[in-house]
Each structure stands twice: as C-alpha cells, then as structure tokens.
Amino acid sequence: MAEKVIMLGNEAIARGAYEAGVKVSSAYPGTPSTEISEYLVQYKDDVYEEWAPNEKVATEVAVGASLAGVRSMACMKHVGLNVAADPLYSVSYMGVNGGL
C-alpha cells in the first residue's frame, strides 16, 4: 500500500511536477507561488530551476524547453498571467514538443 504524505499545496505541486517528469522550471517570485520553486530545489539533480526577471520571461524559458522536447513548467501568481500573455498566445498556435 502506498504511503500517505501530508503536504502543503505548493509542496504537492512541486512533487507532482517532479513525478510527472518536469525537467525545467522557471518562475517569477511572488506570494503565494514562490514556495513551488523553493520546494522544487530538493529535486535539483533532476530538475533545472531558475528565477526569471518577470512572468513573460519565465513562460518563454518553459516554452523554449518544451519546444526542445523537455517537459517544463512556468510558475507565477495569477495576476502575473497578463504579463505572460504574449508567449502563451503564441505557443497556443505553435504547439509544443514536451509537456508545458
């Protein structure tokens, strides 16, 4: 039987990303999403993690990795999604090779 683990939401997101095979994660820090990247650091041997100067750049890093065939993730708080809108609109037309 699987072991039950109690986690905070952001910790569970990081664990889920790791278990789903995410290899690249880029994030713009801001509460409450900052902790996702902080929890991902524990998987540093398997996941490349970086802070981005803004949400658009974080999304572009994740899109670039995905276009190269690597499963990736961009983390930001919901109000930063408007800053990341341009690359999100573009990738919706281009498609991806790895998961995003």
Residue ranges and their predicted role:
Residues 1-7:
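Active-site mouth loops of central-metabolism enzymes
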Residues 4, 12, 27, 49-53, ...:
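Residue-level marker of alpha-helix boundaries and capping positions
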Residues 7-41, 60:
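N-terminal glycine-rich anion-binding loops that anchor highly charged ligand groups
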Residues 32-100:
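Thiamine diphosphate
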